[in-house]
């Protein structure tokens, strides 16, 4: 698989699965032995079922959940993406009742693409910012 093809697989996941909730595409793109190497808040398992469940929770809490991809780069089978997620908090999330607030947070993640399927994920999301926007923790005062 070429670098461009690997990037296209990851972009398709971001746009069609995360951004549109198309879980048929999820089934097509994710390897049966997928492993998420980054613990996700909420106790999701580190496998394909856990990733699908996380995506569904996010789309339920933020029905207009989508990402703006700022850039992607690949070294072969690993694709790194920097993106900003956005959405409107219209469903329960982290035990917080819907607030109607528009949220956004940045994420950098790496997905390994093997035989045209996403097989691994590592990532860092700015969940501190998300928690502040949902008033789970107080915003820092400006000096």
Regions inferred by a protein language model and the residue ranges of each:
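C-terminal and inter-domain tail/linker signature
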Residues: 1-143
């Amino acid at each position: 698989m070429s670098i461009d093809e690997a990037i296209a697989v990851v972009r398709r996941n971001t746009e069609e699965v995360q951004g549109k909730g198309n879980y048929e595409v999820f089934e097509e793109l994710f390897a049966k032995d997928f492993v998420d190497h980054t613990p996700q808040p909420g106790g999701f398992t580190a496998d394909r079922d856990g990733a699908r469940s996380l995506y569904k929770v996010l789309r339920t809490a933020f029905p207009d959940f989508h990402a703006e991809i700022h850039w992607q780069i690949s070294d072969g089978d690993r694709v790194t993406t920097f993106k900003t997620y956005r959405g409107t908090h219209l469903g329960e999330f982290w035990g917080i009742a819907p607030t109607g607030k528009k949220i956004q947070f940045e994420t950098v993640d790496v997905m390994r693409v093997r035989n045209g399927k996403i097989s691994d994920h590592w990532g860092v999301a700015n969940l501190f910012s998300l928690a502040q926007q949902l008033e789970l923790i107080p915003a820092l005062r400006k000096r």
